[in-house]
Amino acid sequence: MVNVCICGGGSQGHISAGVIGSNPNYNVNVLTRRPEQWAHDFKSIDLEGKEYRAHIDIITDNAADIIPKCDIVLVCLPGYANVSFLETIKEYLSPTTYLGGVFGGSGFFLAVQKVLGHNVPCFALQRVPFTGRPLEYGHSARLKGYKPYLKVGMMNIPDSERIVNFLKVVY
């Protein structure tokens, strides 16, 4: 079981929680400023009406509660928020935790290097993997469209196939 932390309660965080959490090989957790508004039983619905049902294990606003337990930390925040967010999780990241960004085109790698240094294993998508919106905040999301393909950049990841396989499965 791979432990994933979805960081952020916006559109990408909502959709990712449902889609990734619906896969039985992934245990999903959410780090958000509004944990009291999230439910442990969550779903994302795509354009054809397919439901991705997920159980969110830990929902918190405290990075210390979840970041040390995760194999992959997926940052679903707008680019301007990356530096301050990375400052809040810095002390809890393990050297073996993979840090990912869904908004890579907004300077994700630069923010990682500025805050965490040059040795952090990280990856970032060039563009967001899909479009959508929360239906009921913290409970459900509507997936409105998929990207036909994804481009990903990686830094300090010796087993890149692991990340490629993760992205193929979840997106």
Where are these regions (language model features)?
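Residues at the C-termini of beta-strands that transition into short coil/loop
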Residues: 32-34, 63, 103, 126, ...
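Rossmann-like NAD(P)(H) cofactor-binding subdomain of soluble oxidoreductases
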Residues: 74-75, 79-137
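Short, charged/polar "capping" segments at the starts of alpha-helices
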Residues: 36-41, 107-111, 162
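Short acidic low-complexity segments
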Residues: 55-69
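NAD(P)+-binding Rossmann beta1-loop-alpha1 motif at the extreme N-terminus of oxidoreductases
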Residues: 1-51, 67
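A short helix-to-beta-strand connector/capping loop
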Residues: 50-58, 118-121
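Internal alpha-helical scaffold of NAD(P)-dependent oxidoreductase catalytic cores
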Residues: 140-171
